């Protein structure tokens, strides 16, 4: 939650203190870099590794959906599994969709309503971060209770719904509908990170989790091109609708990957 909440807060502060002139961002970035370094340096002293006898508390509460405990899989073995690559492609696709939306968010608001103040635009765009923060908790609980398939498909479905809502917002020039689209988009993107961690542990075990999980997170190297592609599409067509159709296409790839993993699970069972 700190990731999303911090993004919203820093975005507002950045908008307030950064000069409008060319290169005004340099001082703001320098200050942010110093502050981040100081916070990390101080907080690092409060982290203590658990002892060898530490045992995580048992899960309490209602009914949960879980697959049989996975045997510990080494990173090399994981890279040979079809389920890993299907999930990896899913993570790339939906992460790229989220980054494409975030990179074009302020422009989407301006195109829907050109008379918005800069502070208002920052607040509206910040809703993506807020919903990203809240949604991570919701999706973490959802994976525990309903399992991988529903969690992945809900992310896919929310991205498609986000694009449909934003296409409607562009056609009507409605900031209110843009806000709804950003709320949905933030929730959609929020499901990626908790699903990454839960999937890694459920399918490849806890023994090599410290290496396996970062390997899954390397999807962001490729997903980062989502913002580049969406920017190129806007430059070519002068409309953000192309970005929304890109997001729909990426979500469709995600649907196929999730269904393929389900098919492999059924064969394995």
Where are these regions (language model features)?
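C-terminal transmembrane helical hairpin of 12-TM major facilitator-type secondary transporters
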Residues: 97, 120-199
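Symmetry-related core transmembrane helices of the 12-TM Major Facilitator Superfamily/SLC fold
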Residues: 26-46, 244-260
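A late C-terminal transmembrane helix in Major Facilitator Superfamily
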Residues: 3, 189, 203-237
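Interfacial helix-cap and linker-helix signal at transmembrane-aqueous boundaries
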Residues: 7-20, 109-110, 142-143, 230-238
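Membrane-interface helix caps of multi-pass secondary transporters
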Residues: 13, 17, 104-115, 199-200, ...
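Transmembrane alpha-helical cores of Major Facilitator Superfamily
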Residues: 1, 92, 126-130, 157, ...
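Extracytoplasmic gate region of multi-pass secondary transporters
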Residues: 7-10, 76-139, 226-230
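Flexible cytoplasmic inter-helical loops of multi-pass small-molecule transporters
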Residues: 49-72, 268-269
């Amino acid at each position: 939650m700190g990731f999303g909440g911090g993004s919203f807060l820093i975005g507002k502060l950045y908008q307030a203190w950064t000069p409008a002139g060319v290169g005004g961002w340099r001082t703001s970035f320098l200050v942010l870099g110093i502050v981040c370094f100081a916070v990390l340096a101080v907080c690092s002293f409060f982290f203590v590794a658990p002892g060898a006898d530490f045992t995580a508390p048992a899960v309490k509460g209602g009914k949960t959906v879980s697959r049989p405990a996975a045997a510990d899989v080494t990173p090399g073995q994981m890279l040979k599994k079809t389920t890993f690559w299907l999930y990896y492609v899913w993570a790339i696709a939906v992460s790229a969709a989220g980054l494409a939306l975030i990179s074009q968010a302020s422009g989407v608001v301006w195109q829907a309503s050109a008379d918005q103040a800069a502070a208002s635009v920052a607040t509206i765009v910040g809703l993506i971060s807020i919903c990203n923060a809240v949604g991570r908790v919701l999706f973490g609980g959802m994976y525990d209770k309903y399992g991988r398939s529903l969690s992945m498909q809900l992310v896919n479905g929310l991205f498609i719904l986000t694009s449909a809502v934003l296409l409607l917002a562009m056609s009507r020039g409605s900031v209110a509908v843009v806000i709804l689209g950003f709320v949905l988009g933030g929730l959609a993107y929020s499901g990626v990170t908790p699903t990454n961690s839960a999937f890694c542990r459920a399918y490849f075990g806890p023994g090599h989790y410290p290496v396996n999980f970062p390997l899954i997170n390397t999807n962001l190297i490729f997903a980062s091109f989502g913002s580049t592609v969406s920017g190129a599409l806007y430059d070519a067509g002068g409309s953000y609708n192309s970005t929304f159709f890109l997001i729909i296409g990426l979500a469709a790839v995600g649907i196929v990957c999730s269904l393929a993993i389900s098919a492999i699970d059924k064969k394995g069972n």
